[in-house]
């Protein structure tokens, strides 16, 4: 996955659209999801990753419609930017409700049918209304959907997750299509740090590959990781091998 120079570059390089819609859980959101939305326990969960960060005040459940294989359509019970709620993360919208069953009438498409606005302050605000994306099936594994450099004034803030070491020189945020953990449900550790590969491109065009010096943004149950680097040579791509992490449904990650 190519690393963008930041949220501004991501916004400038693509039109407003959903990048992914991931059928994460089918009638299986845990009891704790009631904190996100009263009555969410036992419902479906579908994180939708957007091309731009969005204005939370423009989000309403009625802005989204989930279409099933049969053609039937549902409006979510609720939508939320949690748990991916730290600074500059507000592009993953969790849809909660009844979106069909994986085995007989699965969801196939998410439509944005009303105004969902970007939170741009230094560029033109964009509207996601009229856009759509195909749904990634329940039994598919999670994958990295985007990666972007994080400004120091953001990564140096303390958020809900763990922080990069103070000696960190550069941070890349990796966003997955859905939340990921180890197969035993533990958080990522040292072994997974060494599985992340970051490509660097120097000013003279020479390239090299490193592992992150540390992983951060852990422990907050969202779909973002910080790759903390101890070099100032710009990061230009990120990779993580298949088969090491699982989504909440227990499906192993793809490449």
Identify the meaning behind each predicted range.
Residues 2-255:
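Non-catalytic beta-sheet/beta-sandwich ligand-binding modules that flank or precede catalytic cores
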